[in-house]
């Protein structure tokens, strides 16, 4: 099966990012400049998150094809819905390319997902740290002075480890970390990165300041350290977690670290899906539900 994606979704002025409410998991849709992306898609407490949460949203937005689906790591709460989309794309939303972390960080779950993708006509690639993906028709170069350029850049996991730092293990620590920019707007997507993986990002100086942070690992205690927040200095943060989840996410310590820095925090538990829109200058953030 050959997948050809076109800009058939509803016309978007600028970019639109929606952190879907998939319960205890992640599912993020990014649209703009003629392209549609999905960053992770799964849940550990919502059955058929792909068919019941992700695909209905995509279709409601007029998105019949995803140019890229990024998988930060192989945990079920990040890939269960993607598996459903891959297996059902002959009649549903099509996926052009599945993007995985660097090969040295692959595990059995990622290998199995890649196999399913190939069997269903989806191209599979492993992204390298430093790689850039641009909007449709934009120059595929690092030097691009247009303020309206949309770029998604892979900044982690690092494969060249500086001396004295620990290489992250496959899984959460080696999550794909993506930096998105459009004009003066930028956002950081962190998967479940924590521990050695997060420390490596901080100490290797690949991080910078971002308007919005997608909090790692559903707001767990061991992610989003004070040092990490000092580097990224977000104005707003978004946490994706399930109601009454057995892990206690988001952790009180993480919320306190964000509060201490006066970061406006959104949580899908109470806010439902969270949508960010930007024309490259102004930013709006809307939640599906009203927080209590």
Where are these regions (language model features)?
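Non-globular, low-confidence helical/coil segments that flank catalytic cores
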Residues: 1-292
């Amino acid at each position: 099966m050959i997948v050809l994606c076109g800009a058939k979704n509803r016309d978007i002025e600028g970019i639109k990012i929606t952190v879907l409410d998939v319960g205890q998991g992640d599912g993020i849709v990014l649209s703009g400049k003629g392209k549609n992306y999905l960053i992770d898609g799964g849940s550990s407490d919502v059955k058929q998150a792909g068919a019941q949460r992700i695909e209905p949203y995509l279709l409601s937005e007029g998105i019949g094809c995803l140019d890229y689906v990024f998988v930060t790591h192989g945990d079920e709460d990040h890939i269960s819905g993607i598996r459903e989309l891959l297996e059902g794309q002959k009649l549903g939303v099509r996926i052009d390319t599945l993007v995985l972390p660097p090969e040295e960080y692959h595990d059995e779950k990622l290998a199995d997902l890649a196999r399913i993708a190939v069997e269903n006509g989806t191209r599979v690639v492993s992204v390298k740290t430093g790689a850039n993906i641009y909007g449709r028709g934009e120059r595929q170069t690092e030097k691009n002075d247009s303020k309206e350029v949309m770029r998604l850049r892979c900044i982690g996991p690092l494969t060249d480890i500086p001396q004295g730092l620990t290489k992250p293990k496959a899984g959460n620590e080696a999550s794909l970390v993506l930096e998105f920019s459009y004009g003066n707007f930028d956002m950081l997507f962190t998967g479940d990165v924590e521990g050695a993986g997060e420390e490596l990002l901080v100490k290797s100086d690949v991080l910078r300041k971002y308007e919005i942070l997608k909090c790692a690992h559903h707001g767990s205690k061991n992610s989003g350290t004070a040092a990490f927040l000092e580097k990224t200095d977000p104005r707003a943060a978004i946490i994706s977690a399930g109601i009454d989840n057995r892990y206690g996410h988001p952790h009180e310590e993480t919320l306190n670290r964000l509060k201490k820095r006066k970061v406006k925090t959104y949580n899908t538990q109470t806010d439902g899906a969270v949508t960010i829109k930007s024309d490259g200058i102004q930013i709006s953030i809307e939640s599906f539900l009203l927080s209590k």
